[in-house]
């Protein structure tokens, strides 16, 4: 995805957070990008050679405490609508044998998480053959570690719109599409932000779809008096106007692979 497209997406959705995985870029490049997309803050994990790298951009609307920061996940504590919450941003290991270690870490984190917890990103894994199209059918046992992590952490998927097959790749027998990207929350999150949802957007110069998640504690209902005009994009006060009407905060998750 080009920098220009990132800027356009941020102007369109005014997200409170933006997570980039597989950035392959150093901090100086990402700091320049931060200025272009208009975020107040940036936390990065440096890539190793020509692979890896994470970046979390966020606005001053959120007081963020970083709890864990490494090449696979960023774990934070923040306040949303007066509620203390936890948020984890994931980039699952593309190497299958290495994924179990990530699931174990998440389960250790989940044991002590009774407060609202939101987790989102590219997990590089699916829960079953129903989340893939094309390629060879996988054995049911291969999905068990990921499912066990989800169950152990008490995570529940959010409703979504759009095409759930968020990644497309090529294999010897043709194209493969999988739902590698998702957002989930524990029971407490669903209790507080009961109308949280996500949307799979278009693929823009990437093999992953953009994933947009809206955090809502009530239905997003726009009155007939509120008419959105694209000419407002980028204008001062747009984000505040939308939040006042819908009461929501948006996270945009973009994979740079």
Predicted regions and their residues:
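A shared catalytic/ligand-binding motif for oxyanion handling
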Residues: 1-257
């Amino acid at each position: 995805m080009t920098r220009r497209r990132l800027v356009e997406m941020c102007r369109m959705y005014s997200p409170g957070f933006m997570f980039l995985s597989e950035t392959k870029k150093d901090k100086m490049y990402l700091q320049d990008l931060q200025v272009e997309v208009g975020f107040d803050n940036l936390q990065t994990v440096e890539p190793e050679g020509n692979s890896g790298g994470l970046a979390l951009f966020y606005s001053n609307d959120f007081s963020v405490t970083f709890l864990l920061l490494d090449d696979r996940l960023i774990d934070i504590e923040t306040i949303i609508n007066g509620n203390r919450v936890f948020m984890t941003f994931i980039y699952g290991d593309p190497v299958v044998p290495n994924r179990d270690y990530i699931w174990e870490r998440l389960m250790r984190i989940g044991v002590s998480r009774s407060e609202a917890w939101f987790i989102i990103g590219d997990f590089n894994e699916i829960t079953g053959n129903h989340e893939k199209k094309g390629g060879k059918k996988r054995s049911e046992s291969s999905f068990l570690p990921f499912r066990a992590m989800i169950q152990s952490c008490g995570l529940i998927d959010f409703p979504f719109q759009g095409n759930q097959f968020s990644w497309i790749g090529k294999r010897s027998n043709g194209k493969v599409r999988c739902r590698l990207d998702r957002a989930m929350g524990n029971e407490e999150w669903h209790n507080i932000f009961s109308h949280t949802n996500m949307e799979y957007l278009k693929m823009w110069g990437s093999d992953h779809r953009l994933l947009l998640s809206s955090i809502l504690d009530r239905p997003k209902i726009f009155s007939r008096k509120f008419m959105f005009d694209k000419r407002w994009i980028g204008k001062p006060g747009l984000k505040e106007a939308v939040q006042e009407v819908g009461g929501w905060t948006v996270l945009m998750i973009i994979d740079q692979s």
